[in-house]
Amino acid sequence: VLAESWEVSPDSTVWTIRLHQGVPFHHGYGELTAHDFIFSMENSVEKGTSRSPKLLKRHFFPEGGGMTVVDDHTFQVDTVVPAWSLPWDVATGMDNYMGTGVISKKYYDEQGEEKAGYTKAVGTGPWRSIKHTVGGTWRFEAVENHWRKTPNFTELHYIEISEESTRLANFLAGKLDTATFNLESIAQIEKDCQK
């Protein structure tokens, strides 16, 4: 939850968002600021890197509206029309459904688009990216003394398995702790787990 608080204008179109202070980026890339937040949203819209760039643009950069920095930890969003979900979207770093997160502008400027995007992402979460193979796996390590809470286990591996049957076989064989499945696979999982 990156947003500490927010206020909305009486007509529900101008939102003032205050970010938590002292939220560090991974790998020593400074503290999260309103500048990083706006840069991340603008970059996702410009590059089309979010899952829903059109929705992101309509939500944060509508014609006649947009985002502005008030101070290092405060920014405003003029949505032109009421946007009831805006506090939730900001508080969760937009990753919940729009598929974009807040990244360090400093890291992006130093390392370039490819590395800063997904090769070695630098964020603020309880897991720090340590290795990524395109189309394969992500390896994360727990961030000690994370500003919210240190995770209960030291490493997290995210494996991209696009084929449902392969994902299901790995899960049933105990090679995956959790996975997403189509509804059609649930009966097979329930049947095999009852054995």
Summary of predicted features, one role per range:
Residues 11-14, 18-21, 36, 53-107:
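Surface-exposed binding/hinge segments that line
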Residues 22-24, 44, 82-85, 134-136, ...:
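Solvent-exposed loop/turn segments at secondary-structure junctions
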Residues 91-151, 155, 165:
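Gly/Pro-rich hinge or "lid" segments in bacterial periplasmic/extracellular proteins
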Residues 115, 143-189:
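Ligand-site clamp/hinge motif
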Residues 2-51, 76-78, 158, 167-172:
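Aromatic- and charge-enriched surface segment that lines or borders ligand/interaction sites
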